[in-house]
Amino acid sequence: MKKFICDVCGYIYDPAVGDPDNGVEPGTEFKDIPDDWVCPLCGVDKSQFSETE
């Protein structure tokens, strides 16, 4: 599964970890995160994330 980085603050979304504090279970791919999810650090939406290694 691919990781995605927030272009604003540098937060890295790792699908293996998810974002359980915000309702995203481990194992959830970025494309499967709800559209209303926002970066847990800076609050921008999914459109502000880019694929990373």
Curated annotation (Swiss-Prot):
As recorded in UniProt, coiled-coil segments are none
Query: Domain Rubredoxin-like spans what residues?
Result: 1-53
> What highest taxon heads this organism's lineage?
Bacteria
For molecular function, the Gene Ontology terms on record are: electron transfer activity; iron ion binding
Cofactor: binding details: Binds 1 Fe(3+) ion per subunit.
Provide one Gene Ontology biological process annotation: alkane catabolic process
Tell me its cofactors.
Answer: Fe(3+)
Q: List, alphabetically, the Gene3D superfamilies matched.
A: 2.20.28.10
Keyword annotations from UniProtKB, A to Z: Electron transport, Iron, Metal-binding, Transport
Q: Where does Fe cation bind?
A: C6, C9, C39, C42
What family name appears in the similarity comment?
Belongs to the rubredoxin family.
PANTHER family named among the record's database cross-references:
RUBREDOXIN, RUBREDOXIN-1-RELATED
* Described purpose of this protein according to its UniProt entry: Rubredoxin is a small nonheme, iron protein lacking acid-labile sulfide. Its single Fe, chelated to 4 Cys, functions as an electron acceptor and may also stabilize the conformation of the molecule.
Q: What is this protein called?
A: Rubredoxin-2
Name the source organism. Clostridium perfringens (strain 13 / Type A)
What lineage does UniProt assign to this protein's organism? Bacteria, Bacillati, Bacillota, Clostridia, Eubacteriales
Q: Its encoding gene is what?
A: rubR2
